[in-house]
């Protein structure tokens, strides 16, 4: 039996092994079998089936007893994975106790087993995601605090703007992760609910015992009992997928920024170095942003997967034709992609290399122009905004045309020196003195991160 998806050549790069195991063949089958075992226990508790039927059914509810290849061939004609699995389960039970076989899957429908099994998988997936988000947030918090006062060029439209700090850039991602963690925490009780409605959602086959069985089944599985079955109401799954799309997008933005800062012309930060990491098959000098590539790839693929789940929402009546089927591989792939991106982001940040000297040197590439705003604002307080803007703009133009430092041009301009001393100009043109509220933003992001805390859930 396969414990991981078959596409291992690329999955090891793009996906995290623990999440791949959750959605492996074994993981999928075990989720449905856990539902079937819990159903037998719940029906025995409520007197629907004899207590003697429970042990034989439970003993047969182990994924390793079943051949996924044989089941896969049967799925091709059955239309879903639960039908051949329940048949195989019945045969397995009958081999040990023919009487107990009569009570397998009693009152349930295929989608009950598949959806409840999926929710059990998602519980494990959610725990893994929350753990990795917490770890990534902790590493981010440490790095943001460490570099709260490390100046580098802010970039707007990919051009140098005014100085910012590396800590502020990292705190931006930390704030996004805090919000994503809040979203996952809020949706958890909505997502982790039982699916149990029988043929058309009424549980008519169980008569007056329907609600007692449903309540007992939810308790057995540790899931909430929803207001009614949700066979064709898929908002819970789509909400979860949407948050994963947000996580992927935030990580992709970070990967994009890191890769741009790693460009030869910038050289301000680098992914961790290591033997064989980020090399080229032809150019020995290359140090490619291989982790950033995973973050960007996940952010590129995730919107399409989320879109598929949105497109699958208008499901027909009480059981969908094709739209439900479109979910089966889409949501697991999204979970695996986001988990892989989180793992890569953690490794990237834990070993992030920062060249603060190169950052300061790059700030000087425009010969002081990135601090022109600081001078303009200081002059505006004395000669008015428009006059100050016009004067500094003229000085900037001369500095560019003459390829000189803005400080020198400003010092020679009588209208400037009449208002600002040399010491004042030096201070205004020092990036460290024009960082605004960058440190405050870092501190606020750190405070929100620490206030959220962590609520561990077993995977």
UniProtKB/Swiss-Prot annotation:
Gene3D superfamilies: Fumarase/aspartase (C-terminal domain), Fumarase/aspartase (Central domain). NCBIfam families: PRK09053.1 (NF006554), protocat_pcaB (TIGR02426). Pathway: Aromatic compound metabolism; beta-ketoadipate pathway; 5-oxo-4,5-dihydro-2-furylacetate from 3-carboxy-cis,cis-muconate: step 1/2. Keywords: Aromatic hydrocarbons catabolism, Cytoplasm, Isomerase. It is found in: Cytoplasm. GO terms for molecular function: 3-carboxy-cis,cis-muconate cycloisomerase activity; lyase activity. Its EC number is 5.5.1.2. Belongs to the class-II fumarase/aspartase family. Homotetramer. It catalyses: 2-(carboxymethyl)-5-oxo-2,5-dihydro-2-furoate = 3-carboxy-cis,cis-muconate + H(+). This is 3-carboxy-cis,cis-muconate cycloisomerase. It is an enzyme of class 5 (isomerase). The keyword Isomerase applies. Catalyzes an anti cycloisomerization. Signal peptide: none annotated. GO terms for cellular component: cytoplasm. One of its GO terms (biological process) is beta-ketoadipate pathway.
């Amino acid at each position: 039996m396969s414990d991981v998806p078959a596409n291992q050549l690329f999955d090891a790069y793009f996906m995290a092994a623990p999440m791949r195991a959750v959605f492996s063949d074994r993981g999928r089958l075990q989720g449905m079998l856990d539902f079937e075992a819990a159903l037998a226990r719940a029906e025995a508790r409520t007197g629907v089936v004899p207590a003697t039927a429970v042990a034989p059914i439970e003993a047969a509810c182990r994924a390793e007893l079943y051949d996924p290849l044989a089941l896969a061939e049967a799925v091709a004609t059955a239309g879903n994975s639960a039908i051949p699995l329940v048949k195989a389960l019945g045969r397995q039970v009958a081999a040990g106790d023919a009487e107990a076989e009569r009570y397998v899957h009693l009152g349930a429908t295929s989608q009950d087993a598949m959806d409840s099994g999926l929710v059990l998988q998602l519980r494990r997936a959610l725990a893994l995601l929350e753990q990795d988000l917490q770890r990534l947030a902790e590493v981010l918090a440490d790095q943001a605090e460490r570099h709260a006062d490390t100046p580098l060029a802010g970039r707007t439209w990919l051009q140098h703007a005014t100085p910012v700090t590396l800590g502020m850039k990292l705190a931006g991602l930390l704030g996004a992760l805090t919000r994503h963690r809040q979203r996952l925490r809020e949706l958890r009780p909505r997502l982790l609910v039982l699916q149990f409605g029988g043929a058309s959602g009424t549980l008519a086959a169980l008569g007056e015992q329907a609600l007692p069985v449903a309540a007992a089944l939810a308790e057995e599985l540790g899931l909430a009992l929803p207001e009614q079955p949700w066979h064709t109401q898929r908002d819970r799954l789509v909400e979860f997928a949407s948050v994963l799309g947000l996580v992927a997008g935030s990580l992709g933005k970070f990967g994009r920024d890191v890769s741009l800062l790693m460009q030869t012309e910038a050289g301000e930060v680098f992914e961790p170095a290591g033997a064989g990491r980020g090399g080229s098959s032809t150019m020995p000098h290359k140090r490619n942003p291989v982790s950033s590539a995973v973050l960007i790839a996940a952010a590129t693929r995730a919107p399409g997967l989320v879109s598929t789940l949105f497109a699958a929402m208008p499901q027909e009546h009480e059981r969908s034709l094709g739209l439900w089927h479109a979910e089966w591989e889409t949501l697991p792939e999204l979970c695996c992609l986001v988990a892989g991106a989180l793992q890569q982001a953690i490794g990237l940040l834990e070993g992030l290399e920062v060249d603060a000297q190169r950052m300061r040197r790059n700030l000087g590439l425009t010969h002081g122009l990135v601090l022109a705003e600081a001078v303009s604002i200081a002059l505006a307080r004395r000669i008015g905004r428009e006059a100050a803007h016009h004067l500094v703009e003229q000085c900037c133009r001369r500095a560019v045309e003459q390829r000189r430092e803005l400080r020198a041009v400003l010092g020679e301009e009588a209208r400037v020196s009449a208002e600002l001393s040399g010491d004042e100009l030096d201070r205004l043109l020092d990036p460290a003195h024009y960082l605004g509220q960058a440190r405050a933003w870092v501190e606020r992001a750190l405070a929100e991160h620490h206030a959220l805390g962590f609520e561990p859930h077993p995977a």
